[in-house]
Structures are given as C-alpha cells and as structure tokens.
Amino acid sequence: MLAGTLLLLTACEQQTRRLTSSLEPDSADLHITEAPWESQAQMTRRMNHVTTYLKNATGLKVRYVPAINYAHSYALVERGEADLILVGIYGGYRLLKALPNAVPLVVQKPSYRLVMLGHRRWLEELETDEEPGLASVTGRRVGFGSRFSGSAFLQPLLAMQREGLTSADIDECLHEPVQRHLPAQVANGMVDFVFIPSHTDKNDQFIPEPLRDELAIVWTGPLDRNDYLIGVNKPMDKKQQSNLQKVQQAFLELDRTADDGRAVLDAYMLPGFELPTSQFPEATNHRIEALLSGSGGLPTCEAS
C-alpha cells in the first residue's frame, strides 16, 4: 500500500537536512521526532525504546531528534531535519496539509478516549435535575493541553463541536503543555474542568493517586484514534522509500511477544498500529478543516 502511495506522490523540491552543530557527522538512516507532551527525560526514554526496536526489526539506524515544543517538532519535519514524526491529530493535519510528500504510514489501533475531569465536590453538589456532561463547560474555566496538542486540545474542540458548543462558550481557559499536570489544575482551583487523554480501559489513568479522592470523571468520549506516524517521502530517493516501507512494516508488526516490542507499546500505552483508513486520518482531517475554517483558525486560551 505504501509503495503505491509513495510512487504516486509528485516530485517537489527536495529538502536539505540541516543537522544541528552539536551532532557529529551523521550516520543515521532516518531521523524521528515527536512533540514533547511529557518531560524531556520521559520523551527520551520512550524514544530509546522506539529506536532500539526499529534497529532490531529493520537494521536501520534511526536517530531521535528532540523538539523544544509542539511547533518545533513540526518545524523539524518541515525543514527536513526529521524524516519521521509521531503525531496527534493536529500535528498530522498541519503536516499533511503543508507537505505534499508527507505520508501517513501507520495509525494507532482504536484505543484513545477523551476524558473530562472535574472536582468531586462539584459533582456531589449538583442539583438532582442537573446532568454532568460536556455541556458543563459552558461559562466555566477549562484547562487543555498545549494549543498544538491533538489529544488534549483539538480533540476536546471537536467533541464540543459535535455538541453544538464552541470555545466561545467557555468563560476562561488555560494551556498546560505537560498533560500529566492537568489534573492538579482542578485540584488547586485554577480551573473547573480539564480534558485529558486515556489510552487504556482505565479512564482515570492520568489522575495522580493523591488526587483521586478530590477528582471525578465528568464525561468520557467514545473509543477513537489520535496518534499516527508520518514519514516524509523523497520521490527521487529509492533508498528513502525503502527505508520508510521497512519502518511501516516494523510498526505494523509491533506486538508484546518480544521485549523490545512490548517496551514500545507499553511506553505509549497502545495496543498496536495498523494501516490508515478512509476514516482516519482522512475523514478526521476534513472535520478539523471544517472546525478551523469556522472559527477563523486554531483557537487559543492566550489573551490577544
């Protein structure tokens, strides 16, 4: 499937990789990056699992290129400094729109679920005729992930859109790039609700143990997808095409029967990967396009 997709892509200006001055002469076959949705130490540990697995599965040397923030991770791909990127729905939408040679290689098997957290006291004090749910954000203070996060900002906006809500219905909001810090924003009273992703059957997986008595799940979305792997094809570079196909196949074969594969899936809390479908990311990107065109671009919690 990938081979046909890659060959059908029209040639465009080949990008030159600009390696950072701190790197020695580069012997890597491919470079991979990811938006830093957790601390850099955690990102590095996770990527070490990925590059080790890919080395064992394909024989390729894949170098991890750390990103300063979400926007920087996208820029690394746009500038040709990374050939592969693990993205959520916003990063994928942005890169596939900006780069004609960007190709979705694999997508996560359905395992993503959006979770809305509130204070347990608020839930207990609701009137009997009040139903907690997504509409509860109206007129409230809400915490999201990074403005460029798919799982913790764009996914909530899409969920709100399906309920006839927009970001204008929220009183105040804030962005917290490190998603694991979001539950504490409710506990300390900075916001009334936060949106966090769940990647397992445990929807409260990101609620820290000390906060479990204070916080409660207000609403959960349906089982869905958010993450996928994008590769940048170079139409005239047959070796690059072959390398991308090897990486694609390695991700498709990821399972927990071997230690290195189990380490990757456990690090990302995913059941595995499969080929892209007409629904994801294609149909999802159409919904994102409609959302952004209707709101004049990507909303933000920052004051203008």
Language model features with spans:
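Beta->alpha turn/N-cap motifs
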Residues: 34, 66-70, 81-100, 108, ...
